């Protein structure tokens, strides 16, 4: 009995530390999200025409990455301290899309990135199928 009570107390303490860490991370991500909003506004309203379209698209994708990480943390607290797999897949797809937009010099690399996106989409389909669905 004493061992199981100690284990439960240790698990609760570690869960509290994890929750505090995630709240700190969420706060940092919100700050970066606000900074990215100002950056997007600056690129949209002030930048020159030549570079602004690439910077705008890259900024939008980075914005969505921050947004997805914040949504993942929110979902973690809403779902009883559980990270849904599909949110990690969404983040992976968005990160690879950003990589394609930023670094598209090599056609073979772009093809490999596209294949990785296809693999992640198939994984997302399988994760959302009735056989594997938990939610």
Curated annotation (Swiss-Prot):
Q: Name one Pfam family in it.
A: PsiE
| A GO cellular component annotation in the UniProt record | plasma membrane
Subcellular locations according to the entry: Cell inner membrane
Q: How does it sit in the membrane?
A: Multi-pass membrane protein
Principal localization reads membrane
Q: Example GO biological process term?
A: cellular response to phosphate starvation
Q: Which keywords annotate this record?
A: Cell inner membrane, Cell membrane, Membrane, Transmembrane, Transmembrane helix
Q: InterPro entries, from UniProt?
A: P_starv_induced_PsiE (IPR009315), P_starv_induced_PsiE-like (IPR020948)
Spell out where the chain crosses the membrane. Answer: 14-34, 54-74, 82-102, 107-127
NCBIfam families hit by this protein: PRK02833.1-2 (NF002764), PRK02833.1-3 (NF002765)
Q: Which family does it belong to?
A: Belongs to the PsiE family.
The family database entries (HAMAP family) matched by this protein are listed as: PsiE
Know the name of this protein? Answer: Protein PsiE homolog
> What's the source species for this entry?
Pectobacterium carotovorum subsp. carotovorum (strain PC1)
> Could you tell me the gene encoding this protein?
psiE
């Amino acid at each position: 009995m004493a061992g199981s009570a100690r284990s439960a107390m240790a698990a609760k303490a570690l869960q509290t530390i994890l929750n505090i860490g995630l709240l700190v991370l969420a706060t940092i991500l919100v700050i970066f999200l606000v900074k990215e909003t100002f950056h997007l506004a600056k690129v949209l309203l002030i930048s020159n025409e030549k570079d602004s379209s690439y910077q705008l698209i890259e900024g939008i994708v980075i914005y969505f990455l921050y947004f997805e990480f914040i949504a993942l943390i929110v979902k973690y607290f809403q779902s009883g301290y559980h990270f849904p797999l599909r949110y990690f897949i969404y983040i992976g797809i968005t990160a690879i899309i950003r990589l394609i937009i930023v670094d598209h010099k090599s056609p073979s690399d772009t093809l490999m990135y596209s294949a990785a996106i296809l693999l992640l989409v198939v994984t997302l389909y399988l994760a959302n199928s009735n056989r594997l669905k938990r939610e």
